[in-house]
UniProtKB/Swiss-Prot annotation:
SMART domains: AAA. It is an enzyme of class 7 (translocase). Coiled coil: none annotated. It comes from Dechloromonas aromatica (strain RCB). The keyword RNA-binding does not apply. GO terms for biological process: lipoprotein localization to outer membrane; protein localization to outer membrane. The complex is composed of two ATP-binding proteins (LolD) and two transmembrane proteins (LolC and LolE). This is Lipoprotein-releasing system ATP-binding protein LolD. PANTHER family: IMPORT ATP-BINDING PROTEIN (PTHR24220), LIPOPROTEIN-RELEASING SYSTEM ATP-BINDING PROTEIN LOLD (PTHR24220:SF689). InterPro entries: AAA+_ATPase, ABC_transporter-like_ATP-bd, ABC_transporter-like_CS, ABC_transpr_LolD-like, LolD_lipo_ATP-bd, MacB-like_ATP-bd, P-loop_NTPase.
Amino acid sequence: MSESILIARGVSKVFRGGGLEVPVLSGIDLAVQPGETVAIIGASGSGKSTLLHLLGGLDTPSAGSVTLMGRDFSALGEVDRGDWRNRHLGFVYQFHHLLAEFSALENVAMPLLIRRTERHAALAKAAEILTAVGLGHRLEHRPGELSGGERQRAAIARALVSDPSCLLADEPTGNLDSHTASVVFGLLIERVRQQQVSLIVVTHDQQLAAKADRVLNLNDGILCE
């Protein structure tokens, strides 16, 4: 089997405040293979988003470790961690977080421009992937001129434009009606498989989760098949 893209070993998280300790995650073990799609389901408040933040190096576990492309986040300084995360991970959230003053094309090109990719090349790559997600006719439209489903398509395109090793998606269709959610989720699965990108997606929708290669349940802080 190929080397895992992302590995969590014994990951636990305890929130502390006001003299109280609130355990959220306990002994999470997870290994995601290249090109694999993994769905994590669980009730609201079960810690799904917390787990995704830990897997993405956006937060530090109370115990255990998270390794991305062979490097342990805990062994990296803040700058190196950010660079490694930006190089290998893409993120999609329930809310699109597109910048209102920029077009869909400019929003999707933004990660490449931040990396100092030549502007013409960045815009060409953004146009290519927007076309692939069905927005080739909406390149110059701003977020306010797009439907909810179109905004999420643009957010997916932005997350994939820099060819990440793994995509982390937190309820990416949670703000959409059921029909649009099914279409957008199907598109997400299709794009990551075509680009051979690993995907970890958090969702409460079991029907959507069933489209992934593997479905895991998070219950009482424990992740299981």
